[in-house]
C-alpha cells in the first residue's frame, strides 16, 4: 500500500524557530502519552527528533479522526489538508486555525493548535527522513479519511479483514516508519538487519494497537462513537454492535472478543520476535521498544479474564506498581534475549511486581 515518493518543499527555518519547536515537542509529549514520552527519551540525537516528530504527527491525525462531534466530511477534509500542510509551509502555518473547532482531550488539542511547530521540526530533519515520515503519515491519514467517509455515522467495523485493514492504517504504518528510521539513523541496523526487521515491522505496530482497541472498547463506543470489534464476529456469538455494552449480552460479547484477544497474543509474539531481532548494540532502540511491549503483554493478560472493557465506563489498566516494576525489569532484561523471553513468560502468567516498588 505505497504511493509516490513525496518531496517536501525546502525552506529555511531560523535556528531560534527550530529551538522553539523542539522545546514545544518535548513539553507536549508527556501530555499526549506518558509511555511514549519515556520511550522516546531513550533515543539519541536526530533519531530521537525524527521519532518525536513522527509520533506527534500521527497523534495530530489521530485527534482529527477521533473527534466524533465534528462532521465526518469535515474531518476527512481536515486530514487531507493536514497532508498538504506536510509539504507546504504556508499551509502549515494556516492549519491550526482550520482545525480550531475540533473537540477532544486537552493535551491532544494543544498539540493540534501548534501543528505549525511540529512541521518546523519535520523540516529540520534530513531530507530523506522527511520523505519517509511524510510517506507513512500520508498512508495513515488517507486510510483514516477512508474509514471516516465509509462510516459517516461512526466507525462500525464489519469483518476481520476490515479490522486488519484498519489496524494497518493506524498502526502497521507506524511499525514500517520506525523500522526505516532505525535503518537510517542507527549504524547497528544495517541492510541485513533491516530486511529481517521489515518482515515483522507491520506486526510490531499493529500488536500495540490491537491491545489498545481491546482495552478501550467501552470508551471508544461511548466517547468516540467507534466500534472496532467486527459485526460478523459479534453476530456469530448472538450479539451486535447495538448490544456491545449490554449487561444481558456480556458473555456473548466476551466470547467474540476472546477471539481478538487470541489474535492480539499472536501479534504480540510477532512483535517480541521483532524486538529480539534488533541488534543488542542498538540499545537505545531496544529501550524504546521494550516498555510498550511489556505493558501490552500485561494488559492483554488482564483482558483475558476481565469483562470491564465491555461495561459502560469500564476499561482495563495494569497497576502503577506493575508499570514501575516492568520499567525496571524491562530495562535490565533488554540486553539479553533469553532474559527478555523469560520476563515475557512471567508477565503472561501473572502480575509482575517487585516488593520494594511502591504503588
Placement of each model-derived feature along the sequence:
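Catalytic cores of Mg2+-dependent Asp-rich isoprenoid enzymes
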Residues: 1-207, 214, 218-359
Amino acid at each position: 500500500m505505497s504511493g509516490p515518493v513525496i518531496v517536501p518543499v525546502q525552506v529555511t527555518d531560523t535556528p531560534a524557530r527550530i529551538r522553539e519547536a523542539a522545546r514545544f515537542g518535548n513539553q507536549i509529549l508527556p501530555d499526549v502519552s506518558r509511555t511514549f514520552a519515556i520511550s522516546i527519551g531513550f533515543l539519541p540525537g536526530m533519531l530521537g527528533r525524527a521519532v518525536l516528530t513522527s509520533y506527534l504527527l500521527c497523534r495530530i491525525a489521530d485527534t482529527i479522526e477521533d473527534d466524533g462531534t465534528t462532521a465526518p466530511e469535515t474531518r476527512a477534509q481536515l486530514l487531507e489538508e493536514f497532508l498538504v500542510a506536510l509539504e507546504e509551509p504556508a499551509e502549515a502555518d494556516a492549519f491550526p486555525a482550520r482545525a480550531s473547532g475540533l473537540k477532544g482531550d486537552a493535551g491532544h488539542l494543544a498539540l493540534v493548535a501548534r501543528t505549525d511547530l511540529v512541521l518546523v521540526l519535520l523540516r529540520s530533519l534530513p531530507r530523506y527522513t522527511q520523505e519517509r515520515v511524510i510517506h507513512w503519515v500520508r498512508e495513515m491519514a488517507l486510510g483514516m479519511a477512508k474509514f471516516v467517509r465509509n462510516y459517516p455515522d461512526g466507525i462500525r467495523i464489519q469483518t476481520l479483514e476490515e479490522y486488519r485493514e484498519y489496524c494497518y492504517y493506524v498502526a502497521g504504518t507506524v511499525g514500517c516508519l520506525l523500522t526505516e528510521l532505525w535503518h537510517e539513523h542507527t549504524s547497528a541496523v544495517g541492510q541485513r538487519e533491516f530486511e529481517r526487521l521489515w518482515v515483522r515491522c507491520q506486526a510490531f505496530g499493529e500488536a500495540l494497537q490491537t491491545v489498545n482497541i481491546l482495552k478501550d472498547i467501552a470508551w471508544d463506543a461511548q466517547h468516540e462513537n467507534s466500534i472496532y470489534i467486527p459485526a460478523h464476529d459479534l453476530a456469530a456469538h448472538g450479539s451486535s454492535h447495538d448490544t456491545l455494552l449490554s449487561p444481558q449480552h456480556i458473555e456473548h460479547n466476551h466470547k467474540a472478543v476472546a477471539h481478538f484477544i487470541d489474535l492480539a497474543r499472536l501479534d504480540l509474539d510477532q512483535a517480541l520476535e521483532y524486538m529480539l531481532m534488533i541488534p543488542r548494540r542498538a540499545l537505545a532502540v531496544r529501550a524504546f521498544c521494550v516498555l510498550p511491549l511489556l505493558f501490552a503483554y500485561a494488559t492483554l493478560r488482564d483482558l483475558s479474564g476481565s469483562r470491564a472493557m465491555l461495561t459502560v465506563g469500564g476499561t482495563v489498566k495494569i497497576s502503577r506498581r506493575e508499570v514501575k516494576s516492568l520499567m525496571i525489569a524491562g530495562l535490565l532484561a533488554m540486553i539479553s534475549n533469553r532474559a527478555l523471553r523469560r520476563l515475557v513468560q512471567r508477565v503472561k502468567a501473572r502480575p509482575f511486581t517487585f516488593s520494594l516498588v511502591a504503588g
